[in-house]
Amino acid sequence: MASRKAGTRGKVAATKQAQRGSSNVFSMFEQAQIQEFKEAFSCIDQNRDGIICKADLRETYSQLGKVSVPEEELDAMLQEGKGPINFTVFLTLFGEKLNGTDPEEAILSAFRMFDPSGKGVVNKDEFKQLLLTQADKFSPAEVEQMFALTPMDLAGNIDYKSLCYIITHGDEKEE
């Protein structure tokens, strides 16, 4: 009888610890942020089974115009979860990344996906199309407002390095 109680206490303690662990993840973010992460998770979870798998990642990349993602890259992404990537794991991964990442570098990395030549610019028209049609779609007015503040080169391409600086440090012209 005593061993049964001890076993039950152990299970209860483990359950409480798991709940505490997952609740800590949710306490790292505001409710609005959690909702945005939930929307992002839903966009990636293409088959709507509550778990992000390799096929989900491949389809997400495909929708973003990147069709030849190496298997190793997809495997590496999935291995970061150390098991099935449900929403709680997804949120935990973002929490870990956001707490240890330089925001400017994270933004630059995202832009580099659209700059295969590494010139530091992205095509304005292609980027505009992505903003209007993918994930959290921008309205045409929002895109124009953003482009009004966006540094462009002479060819009309977005200088994303300067844009990242403005996003993370503010516009040096502002006073």
From Swiss-Prot:
| Gene Ontology cellular component list | A band; cytoplasm; cytosol; dendritic spine; myofibril; myosin complex
**Limits of the EF-hand domain:** 32-67, 102-137, 138-173
Q: Name one GO biological process term.
A: cardiac muscle tissue development
InterPro entries from the xrefs? EF-hand-dom_pair, EF_Hand_1_Ca_BS, EF_hand_dom, Myosin_RLC
Which residues take part in binding Ca(2+)? Answer: 45, 47, 49, 56
Which keywords does the record carry? Acetylation, Calcium, Metal-binding, Motor protein, Muscle protein, Myosin, Phosphoprotein, Repeat
GO molecular function annotation:
calcium ion binding
Q: What are the Phosphoserine sites (modified residues) in this protein?
A: 22-23
**Which residues are annotated with the PTM N-acetylalanine?**
2
Q: Where expressed (tissue)?
A: Predominantly expressed in adult atrial muscle.
Q: How does it assemble?
A: Myosin is a hexamer of 2 heavy chains and 4 light chains.
What's the miscellaneous note?
Answer: This chain binds calcium.
Q: What is this protein called?
A: Myosin regulatory light chain 2, atrial isoform
Q: Which gene encodes it?
A: MYL7
